[in-house]
Amino acid sequence: MHIIAISINHRTADVALREKVAFKADAIRESHLDLFETKSILENVILSTCNRTEVYAVADQIHTGRYYIQRFLARKFGLEVDEIKEMSEVFVGDEAVEHIFRVTAGLDSIVLGETQILGQMRDAFFIAQEEGTTGTIFNHLFKQAITFAKRAHHETDIADNAVSVSYAAVELAKKVFGNLKSKHAVIVGAGEMSELSLLNLLGAGIDNITVVNRTKERAQQLAEKHQTQYADLSNLNELLVNADIVISSTSAQNYVITQEMMNNVLDQRRHEPMVLIDIAVPRDIDPAIELDMNVFSYDIDDLKGLVDANLRERQAAADQIAEQIPAEINEHNDWVNMLGVVPVIRALREKAMHIQQDTMDSIDRKLPDLSERERKVISKHTKSIINQMLKDPIKQAKELSNDKNSSEKLELFQNIFDIEAESEYKKSLAKKERKLSARHILGFE
């Protein structure tokens, strides 16, 4: 059995293409089942976010599995197979396992180390589990990847440092005030950067936010969208007097907050702490403003310097996480290799126990007058003999898990001891047949 991952992401396709191959939320469950019905696919998980569409599968053959996944995607989105090939990356075997770990840990995201993808991957796995399209391999692998990502984020704090200008603005305010929940924030502007700043302020727990814009209707639209307040730009002076945090991002060609305005504001504030953050180009806040010791002012260069430093820290944390992935892959492979050995050992033990039980039945027939104590002693000793006889064969079988020719040698092992173990492949195939049979009986063609 082979693990395959096919990824359409921000590196391989622009946003217009990614939109074409995004699964609708109300169709994702049915899509799992549609792929599961496909020839060669034994297990599958589908991940679909705004930045990536990925299919993970356990297939009986690499080439057929890859083709049927690509064909599935092409048919699902009305494209040609060649179009899917052009916009996707394909990972097989250890590379596919590594890719799953990297994606889950946020190492493959546009925003390096972001944590949202972990929840999205977990949800994708849970949906696949609920629909019955995962089995022994993926149930183990995805749990391992999710656990690894959680641990990696906790140990490295990779997501703690701001790597966007709007988020960095809020982080700077936190450094001044600590907890922001009781603070009043004013956002000057109603564009994309202003909305991102608003979202980050809300995320920091601030609910007293006023959006100010030259066009009052745009301020109203943004404020109502996020259930905050709004005001006309003519009220800015009054708002600044009571504001703790001001984030300005307009397209104005002249200063929106002038020295004269701030002189008046500072006189009324009585030296209360205040943070001014200017993320506009050209600048909205006059750099000539004479600030007192309790007013902290930052512009776009200050923020970019912080973002750049944080990006370096994130990259160092990402490198640290990436260094741990090979060990996780080895752990996964060791577990997979043992999958082939465990049924063989189980079959050997079962055969030995049958022999022991047959022996005890024969003794009972030939020596019917044995006391219960005598029977228990004989049973104990026959089991002991069998366990001693099995010790070396079982040890040899376990060592085969690390042998590159383990399949052939395990088959020889079974022939020598005249046993037959059910392989993981046969179990997966049987599970798939049962699932599809039940689905067809219920009328889901």
UniProtKB/Swiss-Prot annotation:
InterPro entries in the cross-refs: 4pyrrol_synth_GluRdtase, 4pyrrol_synth_GluRdtase_dimer, 4pyrrol_synth_GluRdtase_N, GluRdtase_CS, GluRdtase_dimer_dom_sf, GluRdtase_N_sf, NAD(P)-bd_dom_sf, Shikm_DH/Glu-tRNA_Rdtase
Record GO biological process: protoporphyrinogen IX biosynthetic process
Domain of life of the organism encoding this protein: Bacteria
A single GO molecular function term of this UniProt record: glutamyl-tRNA reductase activity
Site (Important for activity): H99
UniProt-annotated binding residues for NADP(+): G189, A190, G191, E192, M193, S194
UniProt keyword Oxidoreductase present: yes
Pathway: Porphyrin-containing compound metabolism; protoporphyrin-IX biosynthesis; 5-aminolevulinate from L-glutamyl-tRNA(Glu): step 1/2
UniProt xrefs under CDD domains: NAD_bind_Glutamyl_tRNA_reduct
UniProt KW Lyase keyword: no
Domain comment in the entry: Possesses an unusual extended V-shaped dimeric structure with each monomer consisting of three distinct domains arranged along a curved 'spinal' alpha-helix. The N-terminal catalytic domain specifically recognizes the glutamate moiety of the substrate. The second domain is the NADPH-binding domain, and the third C-terminal domain is responsible for dimerization.
Miscellaneous comment text of the record: During catalysis, the active site Cys acts as a nucleophile attacking the alpha-carbonyl group of tRNA-bound glutamate with the formation of a thioester intermediate between enzyme and glutamate, and the concomitant release of tRNA(Glu). The thioester intermediate is finally reduced by direct hydride transfer from NADPH, to form the product GSA.
Assembly and binders: Homodimer.
Name used for this protein in its record: Glutamyl-tRNA reductase
